[in-house]
Amino acid sequence: LPQYNGDFRSMPAYLDAGDWDAAGIKWVNVHPDNREQFDLPTVIGTMIYSDPRNAFPLAILDGTELTMQRTGAAAAVATDHLAVEDATSLGIIGAGVQSYTQLRAISTIRPIEEVVVSDLDEEKVARFVDTFEGEFDVRPGTPEDAAACDVLSTVTPVESPIVEREWLGEHTHVNAMGADAKGKHELADDVLLDAKLVIDDYEQTTHSGEINVPYGEGVLDDEDIYGEIGQIVVGEKEGRTAEDGVTVFDSTGLAIQDVAAAHVVYEHADENDNGYPFDLMGLDG
C-alpha cells in the first residue's frame, strides 16, 4: 500500500514440536506513519490460534504484543549462538517498541551492563533511557556509538544504510531486525560481505530481508550466506567460532515463531484462567 506508506501481511503456519502441535495465522501491518497521523502503533496485529486436529479456533490474541516478544526472542536466540560469550554492551538503533524487547530478551542470555540507544526522535530515546536507567548503564548516542558495542540490534524501517563497516568492533554481532519489506536496507553492503552472515529464511530474506537490496543487485549472492539460524540451532552448522569476526543475523520474522509464541501464551492463559472466554461459533447454545 505505497499510497499509505504501509503494507499488510498474512502469516499462516503449522508447527509440529513433537510433544505438541499447533496452527495459527497472524494478520499484521507495518505503517510507519501511524503514530504521527493517527496516534496508532506502527504495527497492529491479530493472531488466531487453532487446534490443527479440527481447525477449532482456540484463541484470538493481540498479535502486536506477540510480534514484539517473538522478535526480541529471535534476536536473543541468534545472539546466543553468534555473539561473544562475554558480551557486556548492547547498542540499539531505533528506539521504537521493538527496542524494548531487544534489550529484555538479549540481556537474558548475555551479561549486558552498558546500553547505547540511538534514534532521530529524542523523545523516544528519553523514554527508553528513563525505562531502563535503573537496571543498566544506559545512555543516548549516535549510530556510530551504538555500533561499537559488543552486540548491535538495528530496528528501523530505513531504505538507505545507516551502519558503516568501520564503526563496528572486531567481534561485534549485529541483529538486523528492521528490514521486513523489499527495498529496506539498514547495513552497508560491506558489513554483510565481511561478516559471517546468518539468515532466518532464504526465500524471505532474499526477497524482503536485510540482504534483499544487495542480493537483488548482484552485489551479494548465495555464496555469501553462511546458513540459516535453524541450521545452527539444531547443530547442522556451527555458530560463532574463535576465528569469527563480525557476525550478522538477518531476521524477517517467521510465522512459526508466532505460532510458538502463541502456544506459550495460550497454555499459560489456560492453566491460570486468564483471558475472556466467549462462544465465537455459537456452539454453547
Residue ranges of model-derived segments:
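N-terminal Rossmann-fold NAD(P) dinucleotide-binding loop
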Residues: 99-100
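Conserved beta-strand elements of the Class I
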Residues: 90-91, 247
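NAD(P)-binding Rossmann-fold cofactor-contacting core
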Residues: 109-132
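Glycine-rich Rossmann-fold phosphate-binding loop(s) that bind the pyrophosphate
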Residues: 94-96
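Adenosine-phosphate binding glycine-rich loop
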Residues: 185-285
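Rossmann-like adenosine-cofactor binding region
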Residues: 135-219
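Short helix-loop-beta connector
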Residues: 82-89, 111, 169-170
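N-terminal ligand-binding/catalytic initiation module
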Residues: 1-66, 76, 86, 227, ...
